[in-house]
Amino acid sequence: FGPAILQDAMYCISAGTAHTPQLGFAAILKAVNDGDYDFVEVVSEYGRRAKVMKQIFLDNGFQLVYDRDEDQELADGFYFTISYPGMSGEELLSELISYGISAITLDTTGSTRHAGLRICVSHATDERLADLKSRIQLFSHAQI
């Protein structure tokens, strides 16, 4: 875990970055370690929203592309991956865009699975979840 944090996460977000953001990031890490900042509380909103969004897709014929990490179920978080039977990622994205839903295809993320999309949770506010549900339902009914 240590090398992954240092060599993969820390390096990627700080290498080539100006000094001020590095100091800001260091201050956040210090506050977390000192118990002054509860980052879990802040990011738990993404998990709650992802759970609702995932269910909207699943209730309308979509499937999760990545639902497990080895033998453990994936937690809900910043994004999740979905597919729709019989459609490539590009076909699905093209269709969903016509319903006002954007995403990115899995092949652009480096995934070995290409029949699916990555759905970002951060841009979907609670106020927009009803719109998402109605648009996904419209899409689903059009596929029948």
Annotate each predicted stretch with a short phrase:
Residues 26-29, 54, 81, 93, ...:
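Non-transmembrane alpha-helical segments in soluble domains
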Residues 82-86, 121-123:
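Short beta-strand-to-loop capping motifs
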Residues 95-102, 109-144:
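PLP-dependent enzyme catalytic core of the Aspartate aminotransferase-like
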